């Protein structure tokens, strides 16, 4: 099977939505019965985004096989059924690390190591490996054309396209077509210059996706096609929409998928977008609105919680409730108290690292428990719930996590030094281990306890969910906490690590060590988020009576 490649680049400005465009195109091609995968090539020097600040880079998305990757891979998994792996995302740093390791080993037999051919060859090898076994591979190059960091990647995809031939490779370029209110017209010159920049490095785009706040009329698209040497039918207008899940239908209405399948000579059925039509229908036809408070430390950049944001929306789709997220900085709770939490229908505390703001998260868990407000804790959100319960219910004054206070009286959360993954392999860590890539990562088996909320929601005795953490509940102190009324309802593969906790005498208080947001999709939703949003709606109804 010959894989067909679609290379996606962006020009004029950053944040044009290359990831959404790539994922939407993939969704249409998948709906035509094609086996599609998507890759993201990131030009930064970090080996992976695992140690990057969420307020700079946004969320770190974790794949099933435990790779810490770009948040765009989350978009990919939400739009197509193909599961991403560590082969779907790599960086300049990863490429250079691989090449330098080979050089030190003597693999290059004394050759002078250069960007061309050694770095570009390494990029091509990884792209080919990631595309293996798929009919279509969509390859998104991060950054903006013209950035110095992107040049090796652009050169590599130029070479690869030449090697596989015109019938197996196409280039799709996203640009901005701004509307100038003073002139009362759309301006195409930035797009022309962006394409000129691409041409200067040997790439002629086959398709232009033109981003704008309005539909670009046919005469303007014809003008863009003429000056950029692209057929008019391949100049696609992608206007701003109120939901990203409308993009597949928007692109399909302009026959973008047919343009690719015709060029590639692929015979396949017409795209059935009924599942996406259902998503859009559910989104537009909610019966009520709930407000969920997200208490975190990275709230200045909502993209730091991208998958959580989307999972809450998916929970709303499955319960016919519109979800409004109120972002609350946990540090503000420390200074202003519970007033910031008033009027919420539910409280969610997501994952995070470091001591800053942790006491505010503990207060949020306390407020939710004492006021019977639905609470969902994720990763650190479970740990702070344990700390709060230990302090205020189990009588363990001074309880904390050893991550934040090593000499605390009751270290109810501590470093995981050893665990068994779902395949039976023993993983070990110490406090001296590197920060990058050393956490408990990826999909892990979890046993659910009978007669628990989570067992009822999932409808299965075992589940697989993705993890990203170094710290876990201290089992030595667990009996005292459980005796006070908290219940452990989820356990790891070897049944030694606490994965889920509940408070039985609370209407809905559930916290998980794993990250359920990474497996939520708009078409299928997720059991935990659907249950959480439903509980928020029920809480709202109780308070309106």
From Swiss-Prot:
Residues that hold ATP according to the record: 15-20, 72, 239-241
Record bears the keyword Cytoplasm: no
GO BP field: 'de novo' CTP biosynthetic process; pyrimidine nucleobase biosynthetic process
UniProtKB keywords: ATP-binding, Glutamine amidotransferase, Ligase, Magnesium, Metal-binding, Nucleotide-binding, Pyrimidine biosynthesis
Regulation: Allosterically activated by GTP, when glutamine is the substrate; GTP has no effect on the reaction when ammonia is the substrate. The allosteric effector GTP functions by stabilizing the protein conformation that binds the tetrahedral intermediate(s) formed during glutamine hydrolysis. Inhibited by the product CTP, via allosteric rather than competitive inhibition.
Quaternary assembly: Homotetramer.
Protein name in the entry: CTP synthase
UniProt source species: Aeromonas salmonicida (strain A449)
């Amino acid at each position: 099977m010959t894989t067909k490649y679609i290379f996606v680049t962006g020009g004029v400005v950053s944040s044009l939505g290359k990831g959404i465009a790539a994922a939407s195109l993939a969704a249409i091609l998948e709906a035509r019965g094609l086996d599609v995968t998507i890759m993201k090539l990131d030009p930064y020097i970090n080996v992976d985004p695992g140690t990057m600040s969420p307020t700079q880079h946004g969320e770190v998305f974790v794949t099933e096989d435990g790779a810490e990757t770009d948040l765009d891979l989350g978009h990919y998994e939400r739009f197509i059924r193909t599961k991403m792996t560590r082969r779907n995302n790599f960086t300049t740093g990863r490429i250079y690390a691989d090449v330098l390791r080979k050089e030190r080993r003597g693999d290059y037999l004394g050759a002078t190591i250069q960007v061309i051919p050694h770095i570009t060859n390494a990029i091509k090898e990884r792209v080919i490996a990631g595309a293996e076994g798929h009919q279509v591979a969509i390859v998104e190059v991060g950054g903006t054309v013209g950035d110095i960091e992107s040049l090796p990647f652009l050169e590599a995809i130029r070479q690869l396209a030449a090697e596989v031939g015109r019938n197996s490779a196409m280039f799709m370029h996203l640009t901005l077509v701004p509307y100038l209110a003073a002139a009362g017209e759309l301006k195409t010159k930035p797009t022309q210059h962006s394409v000129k920049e691409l041409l200067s490095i040997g790439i002629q785009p086959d398709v232009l996706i033109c981003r704008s706040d309005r539909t670009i009329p046919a005469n303007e698209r014809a003008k863009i096609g003429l000056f950029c040497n692209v057929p008019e039918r391949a100049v696609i207008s992608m206007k701003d929409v109120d939901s990203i899940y409308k993009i597949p239908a928007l692109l399909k209405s302009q026959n973008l998928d047919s343009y690719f399948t015709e060029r590639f000579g692929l015979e396949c059925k017409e795209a059935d977008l009924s599942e996406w039509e259902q998503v859009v229908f559910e989104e537009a036809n909610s019966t009520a609105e709930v407000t969920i408070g997200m208490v975190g430390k990275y709230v200045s950049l909502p993209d730091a919680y991208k998958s959580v944001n989307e999972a809450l929306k998916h929970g709303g789709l499955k319960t016919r409730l519109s979800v409004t997220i109120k972002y609350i900085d946990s540090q503000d709770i420390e200074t202003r108290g519970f007033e910031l939490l008033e009027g919420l229908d539910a409280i969610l505390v997501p994952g995070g690292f470091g001591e800053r703001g942790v006491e505010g998260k503990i207060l949020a868990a306390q407020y939710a428990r004492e006021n019977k407000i639905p609470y969902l804790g994720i990763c650190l959100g479970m740990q702070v719930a344990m700390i709060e319960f230990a302090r205020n219910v189990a009588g363990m004054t001074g309880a904390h996590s050893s991550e934040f206070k090593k000499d605390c009286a009751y270290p109810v959360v501590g470093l995981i030094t050893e665990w068994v993954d779902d395949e039976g392999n023993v993983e070990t860590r110490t406090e001296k281990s590197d920060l990058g890539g050393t956490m408990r990562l990826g999909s892990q088996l979890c046993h659910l306890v009978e007669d628990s909320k989570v067992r009822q929601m999932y409808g299965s005795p075992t589940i697989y969910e993705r993890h990203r953490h170094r710290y876990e509940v201290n089992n030595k102190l667990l009996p005292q906490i459980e005796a006070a009324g908290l219940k452990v309802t989820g356990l790891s593969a070897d049944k030694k690590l606490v994965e889920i906790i509940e408070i039985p005498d609370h209407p809905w208080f559930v916290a998980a060590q794993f990250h359920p947001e990474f497996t939520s999709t708009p078409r299928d939703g997720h059991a935990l988020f659907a249950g959480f949003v439903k509980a928020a709606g029920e809480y709202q109804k109780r308070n309106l009576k």
